[in-house]
From Swiss-Prot:
Domain text: The N-terminal region is involved in phosphatidylethanolamine-binding and is required for atg8-PE conjugation. The flexible region (FR) is required for atg7-binding.
InterPro entries xrefs: Atg3/Atg10
Active-site residue list: 247
Gene: atg3
Protein known as: Autophagy-related protein 3
């Protein structure tokens, strides 16, 4: 069944009409030219990524140049398996926050508190911890009367009782799991007009990981749904890899782009308000790194190729002026994420599917 699905998917991509019109801001989709532009940016900023070519000319796609058929990074470590104990709570569902990838609630409306990211492990059915009454038993085995609440104060000396220490059984630590490595491939899906991720695992440099075992490193809700085992169409032969299906990628990226723009706008408003304030505390607070999408905006802005030039121009024009100077009009029209930075954001959200794989190993963001 997977072979048939892989074949149909490959031919659908190759036969679909090629779009040359940029709709990046309105749909979250990119053209082949924009994919190459974003790939060049990723390779330039993060040298662990490189361009790859098909194993033979017949495997190349016509809408991408030879030598730039896909992006690849090799040897990405994966130190843990994602079993039912992932993130601490056994036998509990993963909490999917705005689960775009699996097709649930993909609109940009509502859910403003989570910025469209995924929290996995033990959140779907939260336990409300309760403290039960602690009763003592006398020497005859009879339960003593309930004591007043204010008397239930633990004795600090009890912490020194070596017999009270609960030791973890031997062999239960996660460090006993062998480290796997993955080669990650980013291709362009011409049918969906978005990037697509393939993963190929290894138990050792010379021992490939059986495809079925790759699913141990995929979040449970995505196995065999969003993530399937398919042949990599750029190589001769039948090399199966785990692949994240791109059907929801455009809507996810569109939502993240919109929210990043909103976060940048909010950031600028804060700068304006702080510029009018003489409070050093507010200025110091603004200088601290942000979290969520505002933090992502700061990270992306820090990757801008033109930052050094802008900083140089700012130093010349500032002449000792206030560092909290209000942004110029042309800067206010600037978007939070450019099209050449597309793959940086793409890898940030796709990492939620495989949280055990250290994607940050390939990126310094």
């Amino acid at each position: 069944m997977n072979i048939l699905h892989s074949t149909l998917s490959t031919w659908r991509d190759r036969l679909a009409p090629v779009s040359r019109t940029s709709t990046f801001r309105t749909t979250g989709q990119i053209t082949p030219e924009e994919f190459v532009l974003a790939g060049d940016y990723l390779v330039y900023k993060f040298p662990s990524w490189s361009w790859g070519d098909a194993s033979s000319p017949s495997k190349r796609v016509s809408y991408l140049p030879p030598g730039k058929q896909f992006l690849v990074t090799r040897g990405v470590p994966c130190h843990r398996r994602l079993n039912e104990n992932f993130a601490g709570d056994a036998h509990l569902d993963d909490e999917i926050v705005r689960d775009f990838l699996s097709g649930g609630a993909g609109d940009s409306d509502g859910g403003d508190d989570n910025d469209g990211w995924l929290r996995t492990g033990g959140g779907g059915k939260r336990h409300e911890s309760t403290i039960r009454d602690v009763r003592t038993v006398d020497e005859s085995g009879k339960e003593e009367a309930e004591v007043e609440e204010e008397e239930d104060i633990p004795d600090m000396e009890d912490d020194d009782d070596e017999e009270a220490i609960i030791r973890e059984p031997a062999g239960t630590t996660s460090t006993t799991q062998p480290t796997r490595t993955y080669n990650l491939y980013i291709t362009y899906s011409n049918f969906y007009r978005t990037p697509r991720l393939y993963l190929s695992g290894y138990l050792s440099p010379s021992e490939p990981l059986p495809p079925k075992l790759m699913m141990e490193d995929i979040v449970g809700d995505y196995k065999d749904k969003t993530v399937t085992l398919e042949d990599f169409p750029w190589f001769d032969g039948s090399l199966q890899m785990a692949s994240v299906h791109p059907c929801r990628h455009a809507s996810v990226m569109k939502t993240l782009l919109d929210r990043a723009d909103a976060a940048l706008k909010l950031r600028r408003e804060k700068i304006k308000q702080t510029a009018a304030s003489s409070s050093p505390q507010e200025k110091a607070k603004l200088a601290q790194p942000e979290s969520g999408l505002e933090g992502l905006v700061d990270d992306i802005k820090g990757l801008s190729l033109g930052d050094a030039q802008k900083q140089c121009q700012g130093d010349k024009g500032q002449a000792g002026g206030d560092e909290w100077e209000v942004l110029q009009h042309d800067e206010e029209e600037e978007v939070a994420i450019r099209v050449d930075q597309y793959l940086v954001v793409f890898l940030k959200f796709i990492a939620s599917v495989t949280p055990g794989i250290e994607h940050d190993f390939t990126m310094g963001v």
